[in-house]
A protein has these predicted regions:
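Active-site cores that bind ATP or allylic diphosphates and position pyrophosphate for catalysis
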Residues: 71-399
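A glycine-rich helix N-cap at a beta->alpha junction
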Residues: 58-73
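Class I S-adenosyl-L-methionine
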Residues: 26, 58-62, 171-174, 207
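Structured loop/turn residues at beta-strand edges in well-structured enzyme cores
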Residues: 30, 64, 96
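Conserved acidic residues
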Residues: 3, 33, 67, 98-99
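Short, contiguous strand/loop micro-motifs
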Residues: 9, 44-45, 61, 75-76, ...
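N-terminal catalytic cores of NTP/NDP-binding nucleotidyl/phosphoryl-transfer enzymes
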Residues: 1-57
Length: 399
């Protein structure tokens, strides 16, 4: 087949900016180019539950222009920006049909992002980074200073969240030697966590408004707004972090210290700090604040906390996902799936029961991701929506 567009996303929630990325990419490559998305599941990279379930968000994506939505398994969804990008881009590459990777960025230009990505791949960078860290500055600042030695002012690109992910996508393409042609679209509307004018808002602002009970439908495509309104009416969302606090705290308090020391990122005593905090603090925010160190960002501690509660251990996010689970199928999705079935290097799962027969680590990761859904639904407003085992029963949404 011809060009196939790959997009990595969380769609937390799906908004007008996401629809714009699909439209503008098709404007460059052709209006009928199929779009396959790799999307985080019920828990997202910032270490929080998604405001709506992966099934609702995947349905919104295909109703708003995507043709196929695949789930990024839990260990990569809760990984660092580097691990998240490596897993998602690797999964797109393993399908055997994706020709282009499209992503938004605050920069909007490919060349500067590629220069920063190349600098990050410099084998000598680690030595410079360690030297910066010895001065006691936070990791992000140390990395930026080490990069600045190579690319000067371009290192400032790493201060913007979508630029950071864009650079990690490019690194993943280079590292894995994938034949994916990158495209970037200028991200308009709000910067991360800032208000903006017009009908595009950042996902972080929309989550804040949703948490406050505001109507955000003006900033969503109509189909997405209808889906999320349906989920709210049925008591399946929004799922807010505070709704899961008791479930998470009870889980964290039952875990032995060895589990904390085996978490992703549990270096320099972070595992011990998180263990102590989980057994002393009365709130989840208190746990995060007590475990936080000067060197590492709060998001890292939040991810570690969620990994502990959900059973994710160090090394699970190594390499790339060993299967492709289909969450939703859009207009060209069936044709796309037929092509993927012939060319993919990993099993393609359309019926969740097939996940039980996946061999070795693949089966373990599939089950772990399904178990995470059982914890996620405990945050649903309606008690009848909190049934266990739903991930094993759910079929892909078909447009």
């Amino acid at each position: 087949m011809g060009n196939v567009i790959g997009i990595v996303a969380e769609y937390n929630p799906f908004h007008n900016g996401h629809a714009r990325l699909i439209e503008q990419t098709r404007a460059q490559l052709g209006a009928v180019c199929p779009v396959v998305c790799v999307m985080s599941g019920d828990f997202v990279q910032r270490g929080s539950p998604a405001v709506y379930s992966k099934f609702a968000r995947a349905e919104a994506a295909v109703r708003c222009g995507a043709d196929l939505v695949l789930e990024l398994p839990l260990p990569w969804s809760l990984s660092s920006a580097e691990g998240f990008a490596r897993g998602a881009v690797g999964l797109l590459g393993s399908l055997g049909v994706v020709t282009h990777l499209s992503f938004g960025s605050e920069c909007g230009e490919l060349d500067p992002l590629q220069r920063v990505a190349e600098a990050l791949l410099d084998p000598l960078l680690g030595e410079d980074l360690r030297a910066e860290l010895r001065s006691g500055i936070p990791f992000a600042a140390a990395r930026q200073q080490a990069i600045a030695r190579r690319v000067g002012a371009l290192a400032e690109l790493l201060q913007a969240p979508n630029n950071i992910l864009a650079v990690e996508y490019l690194k993943a393409i280079y590292d894995q030697r994938l034949e994916l042609h990158p495209l970037t679209v200028l991200r308009t509307g709000a910067q991360h966590d800032r208000f903006a004018e017009g009908n595009i808002r950042s996902a972080s602002e929309l989550r804040m408004r949703i948490g406050a009970g505001e109507d955000v439908s003006a900033f969503l495509p109509r189909a997405a707004a209808e889906i999320f309104a349906r989920e709210k009416t049925r008591g399946r969302g929004p799922v807010l972090p505070e709704a899961l606090e008791s479930a998470l705290l009870s889980r964290l308090r039952m875990l032995p210290q060895t589990v904390y020391n085996a978490l992703p990122g549990a270096t320099e005593g972070l595992g011990n700090s998180l263990y102590r905090a989980a057994h002393e603090e009365p709130t989840l925010d208190g746990v995060l604040a007590a475990a936080k160190s000067k060197r590492y960002a709060l998001a890292r501690i939040r991810r570690m906390t969620m990994c502990a509660a959900l059973g994710v251990t160090a090394g699970m996010d190594g390499g790339t996902p060993p299967y492709a689970r289909v969450l939703a199928i859009g207009a060209q999705g069936r044709e796309l799936l037929r092509a993927i079935d012939m060319r993919a290097s990993v099993p393609v799962i359309t019926k969740p029961a097939a996940g039980r027969s996946l061999p070795g680590p693949a089966g373990e990761i599939f089950a772990l991701t399904a178990d995470a859904h059982d914890l996620y639904v405990l945050g649903c407003p309606a008690r009848e929506e909190r049934r266990c085992g739903g991930d094993w029963r759910a079929s892909p949404f078909v447009l």
